[in-house]
Every structure is written in C-alpha cells, then in structure tokens.
A protein has these predicted regions:
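Short hydrophobic beta-strand motif reused across regulatory alpha/beta modules
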Residues: 90, 585, 594-595, 615, ...
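C-type cytochrome heme c attachment motif
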Residues: 581-588, 611-618
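Feature of Fe-S/electron-transfer and energy-metabolism proteins
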Residues: 1-578, 588, 599-600, 606-607, ...
Length: 630
C-alpha cells in the first residue's frame, strides 16, 4: 500500500462523507453494543436481526462500505447509549425511534412493522411517569444532557473507522500537524480551560507545556490512564468502547504538541471489549497511515501501544501506573520528580485520562473559546458521570460543568424511586465525599466541590435514599480503600486498617463517642502523611459522613441502636427469573457476599451482606430485590 499523503487523507474524508450520505438514504438500525447491553443479550438481537433480514431478502450492510441499496438496511453495532438500565437498546434512523428492553422474541415484529412497515411499536418504547417516548432526544434522561465527548457514542459503529472519518475524525490531528506549532497547541488547550478529568483537575495545557519545554530530551511519552477502578464507575470504559478513535486522536495531538513519538494506553484487564476496540482502532489507523512513521509526509512519527493492568486500584495513581507499564510492581513513589519531568522510563511524560484526551479533538477543531463557553469560568467543558444507586434512571450522564446535583439526580435521573426521600449522594468514588440535601443546588465543578470536602474524582455518583445508614456507607468505602492499599506507606497501610476496625466496632453498636474523635485523629494523620493522592483522600468518605450525618454515628455510639440498621432491616435477594448470570453484582460486591456460576442465577449471603447497594446499582436487569424486615 502506498504511503498516505495529506491529499490522500482529504480523499479518504471525501469518500467517507459520500458513503455516509448514501447510508442516510436507507434505514439505519443501531443495536447498542456496549458492555451493559451485551450482557443483556444485545448480540443475540443483532445476530437475529441480521440473519432474519437476509433470509427475507432484505439487503443488509454492516459497515459503510457495504452495498445495500435504498431498499436495504444498515445494521450497526453502536457504542454505549448511556441508558444501560433499559437495554438492550435498538435505534432506528431516520424514523427516530428508540426501542427499550428489546429481546430476540421482539425482532420479528420489529422487522415486519418498523423496518418494512414504518410503524412504531408502542409497547417497546421507553415509558416514564406514564408517558411513552418515541424519540431518544425527548426522553428526560437524554434531553437534559449536553453531550460533547459522548456525542457520537450510540450513533456510530466504534469498529468502523470509515464512520469516524465521515464524522470529521482526525481532521483535528491534521490541523495540529500541519498548521500549528507545539507551543500553539499547548496554548490552545490551556486557553480552553480543559482540566484533567481523572480526578485532580490539573490544567491539561500546563501539563503539556511542561513536557514540551524539555527540548533537550529526545524521548518523551504520552500515556492515557484507562485504569478506571472506582466501584460503579464506567465512564472511561464507555468512551473506549464507543469512540476509541477520539482517544487516539487526542493522544496524537498531544504527541505533536510535546514532541513525543510513543503513546501507551493503560487499560484494566477487566475491560476486554474496550481493549478489543482500541486494538482494532490502532490497527486500522496504522493500516491507512495515520499512525506510524513519517505520518502524511510530515516527518512526525507516532506509535500507540496497549498495556493491560492487573486490576489494582492503586495503579490509577500516576507513578504507580508508569511503574506497572515498565513491568514493575504498581506502587506510588515520592514526588518530586513529577511525571512531566521523569515519568515513564524516567522520561518526560504527559499522563491524562481517557475523557481528557477525548475532549482534545473538539477543542482543536472548534477553538478554545467554543470549549470555554461550556461550563463555568474555572471549570470549562462538560463532565461525564456514572449515575447509580437509589435513583429511577441509572446510566452514563454528560452535563456542562456547573450543573447542579438536583438537575442530575431529579431532572436526568428521575428522582428517588418508591416514594422514598433523598438522603445523600456520594461523589468521586473512594476518594470523594458524601453530600446532603442542602447541597443539591451547589454547582458541580472542581472548586465548589472542594469547598464542600468532596471532589469530582473520576465521576461516580451514588444516590442514597432515607433507608441508608451513612456509617455503613463509610465502612463500605473504607473497606474498599483498605483492601486496595498497596501497603508501601505506613499511614495508608495501618491507618486505614485502624479506621475500618473502628467503623466495624461502631456499626456493631460496641463503640463510644471517643471513637468519633479517634476517626478524626486518624483521618488527619493519614491525610497529612500518606505517600500518594489515593491515601491522602482515602478518609474523605468517612469525614464527610461524620460532618454531614453525625446523627447516624450517634445512634450507634450513644443510643447503641440504629433505627435503620437495627430497626427495619433489608434483606437482599436476586430474582432467579430476572438474573442472567452476568456476574456484575458479584464483581461489585465489596464483601464477596454474592456467588454463582456464569449464565446461572446468582445468590446473596445476607450474613456477609452490608446492604451497601453496590449490587443493586451494578445489575443491568433489575434482578436485585430489597425485602424489608421488621
């Protein structure tokens, strides 16, 4: 194959756009192929639609380059739509129809009535508060979002590079490569206000500029952190599965900006679909000449590699992550030096997370002011959140920075189910904090949350109702943090263990008011002396619950009787008729209280269960039932 030139790149774009236009002349049937919908049986739906349409003489195109004619259909495996709770999802364009909870048994009717007849099947539409919605964009869950990073997820085939090109893919990279200097790229990213989406919120442009200035160093690296370890978080996974080329393009632009020629994507081994789609994206970009040596004759070379993590939460920390890529044990190190000075193999390294890189192409294409016009003055752009817990609509949400918790939980999430009252929301995963009803109207941005003792973190949002004991919530997160501690520094290794023991004593109604002072003292010590950011923020869930929900602790240490824990208890059961045996509940259970065999109904050991609700939030089938006992 001849080497790709700049004019050849333009020709590829023109061809892709023409194929996309031809595709719009026929029905496009999109089956959500995100992990959640696949676990619900989406691939069975896809395969049945494909084979049945073909057997009935309906031409089926499965990629843009396939011929199907106007009488045929384009059947796509799309990226995650975000509304995992109602999967498997099937979208039909241009009829603008979204079907929810689609089963194989529904496919014949979809083919007969909708694909051939153009009719809407009312029973398959999503319904909320008695209202059925045909159009996806009319559903409150989608209507109240502002999608930038997730704009094309759910609307295109992640494994078809031609679609990404047709939607403007890699034009930002071409612009950066041929019309901008490294300094100009870094300035554009800095002026946009883009801050790291992995938790810290450090300005991305400043980080890139720090690496660019190491002009004496010929070897530099771009590293993408896809090690999403927070319980219930799946934002980065959905982007990697649904729009992998946007991540590659962001990394390539960072390479042009800083002079780096090698990139690494560090992905959790538990994300096999993300790894597969990233690998396909890398192979296809390399095949046409967008990755490799002397790209488009520019003299710039860039290669991207995938490194699979072993599932250690601590490897989400920068220095532990780079150590893991190097083949060492993933453990944080003392800083300085920072990764921008001595990162991967001791070389200057840009380390950003998946969502940060996915934002970059849009900024280069549309300009810094476009991006800065979204969000707040100090926190520009949008943020994706994984909305889970005691909320009607769970799933993946993208909103402008500064959106309030009330808008996310009640307007997008649909509020609290079963007529219960809102009690708390935990934001930021194990490094975040718990907020109360009085905080619902605070803007969700880096600075506002910091003042409240919480952080955005990677973007996990766990909603809790009035039947939640906040001491149990604190214990859940401390159990997770203590279990995931790398053990290198004493404050984190021993301090979190002592805090967990204290919390367990309190929950057993064997504690005293002195234990609350002990928790506060331990928290101060760990926060001030732990080696890395994970240890330094490990106590936030405990301290935020102590600050905002102290009465829950007093019930345990003064009354020695918690009306929630010891009054009306909940026994969790898995409904055998709804359980598909996907194992998500077991993977998310911090107490290993759930067991079972793949594709068979799982069971919960209520002696071990701490009623944290992690399984309830993780189950895509609504198979977890909470039975209240007096």
């Amino acid at each position: 194959m001849s080497k790709l030139t700049r004019s050849g790149f333009h020709a590829l774009h023109t061809q892709a756009a023409e194929l996309m236009e031809q595709s719009r002349g026929r029905l496009n049937v999109l089956v959500c192929a995100g992990t959640g919908c696949i676990a619900s049986g989406a691939m069975k739906v896809y395969d049945y639609l494909r084979t049945t349409c073909q057997s009935r003489g309906i031409p089926v195109a499965v990629c843009l380059k396939d011929e199907a004619g106007k009488e045929g259909i384009h059947l796509k495996k799309s990226g995650c739509h975000g509304f995992c709770e109602i999967g498997p999802l099937v979208c039909i364009e241009p009829l603008d129809i979204l079907y929810a909870h689609v089963k194989v048994e529904d496919c014949d009717e979809i083919i007969e009535k909708t694909i051939l007849g153009g009719e809407v099947i009312e029973r398959l539409l999503y319904t909320q508060n008695g209202v059925s919605y045909q159009r996806r964009d009319d559903i409150p869950f989608y209507k109240n979002q502002h999608r930038v990073v997730l704009k094309n997820s759910g609307k295109s085939d992640a494994e078809d590079m031609t679609e990404y090109l047709a939607l403007g893919g890699y034009t930002a990279f071409e612009k950066a490569l041929f019309t901008m200097t490294g300094e100009e790229i870094c300035r554009e990213i800095a002026n946009s206000g883009l801050r790291g989406r992995g938790g810290g919120g450090f300005p991305a442009g400043r980080k890139w500029e720090s690496v660019r200035r190491h002009t004496e160093e010929p070897v530099k690296y771009i590293v993408c952190n896809g090690d999403e370890g927070d319980p219930g978080a799946f934002m980065d996974r959905s982007i990697m599965e649904g729009n992998p080329h946007s991540i590659l393009e962001g990394m390539m632009i960072a390479g042009v900006a800083t002079g780096a020629t090698e990139g690494y994507i560090y992905v959790r081994a538990e994300y096999p679909l993300a790894v597969k789609r990233l690998q396909i994206a890398i192979e296809k970009a390399t095949e046409i000449g967008l990755l490799g040596d002397d790209i488009m004759g520019s003299g710039f070379s860039f290669h991207i590699h995938i490194n699979r993590g072993a599932g250690a939460f601590v490897c989400g920390e920068g220095s532990a992550l780079t150590a893991s890529i190097e083949g060492k044990r993933g453990m944080p190190r003392v800083k300085p030096p920072r990764t921008v000075d001595q990162g991967l193999w001791g070389k200057p390294t840009v380390l950003n997370n998946v969502e940060t890189f996915a934002n970059v192409p849009g900024i280069i294409n549309h300009g810094a002011q476009w991006y800065k016009g979204i969000g707040t003055e100090s926190s520009a752009g949008t943020k994706t959140f994984a909305l889970t817990g005691n909320v009607v609509n769970t799933g993946l949400v993208e909103v402008p920075m500064g959106t309030t918790l009330r808008e996310i939980i009640f307007d997008i999430g649909g509020g609290i189910p079963n007529g219960k009252k809102f009690k708390a929301v935990q934001i930021g995963g194990p490094s975040g904090g718990c907020l109360t009803e009085e905080h619902l109207d605070y803007p969700m941005d880096f600075d506002s949350l910091k003042k409240l003792g919480a952080i955005i973190g990677s973007g996990g949002l766990v909603v809790m109702d009035e039947d939640t004991c906040m001491v149990e919530v604190a214990r859940f997160f401390m159990h997770f943090t203590q279990k995931e501690s790398c053990g290198k520094c004493t404050p984190c290794r021993e301090g979190t263990k002592r805090m967990l023991e204290t919390l367990e004593r309190i929950i057993a109604n064997e504690g005293s008011p002195d234990d609350l002072e002990l928790l506060e003292a331990l928290s101060d010590t760990i926060t001030d002396t732990a080696l890395c950011g994970l240890g330094q923020t490990a106590c936030k869930p405990v301290m935020s619950t102590l600050r905002h929900f102290r009465q829950d602790y007093l019930h345990h240490v003064v009354d020695h009787h918690c009306p929630i824990c010891n009054g009306r208890r909940r026994r969790l059961e898995i409904k055998a008729d709804l359980c598909k045996g996907c194992g998500k509940c077991a993977k998310n259970c911090p107490m290993e209280a759930i067991s079972g065999q793949p594709r068979m109904p799982y069971t919960i050991d209520n002696e071990k269960c701490i009623h944290c609700g992690a399984c309830w939030g993780a189950c895509p089938f609504g198979a977890i039932d909470a039975i209240e006992e007096e």
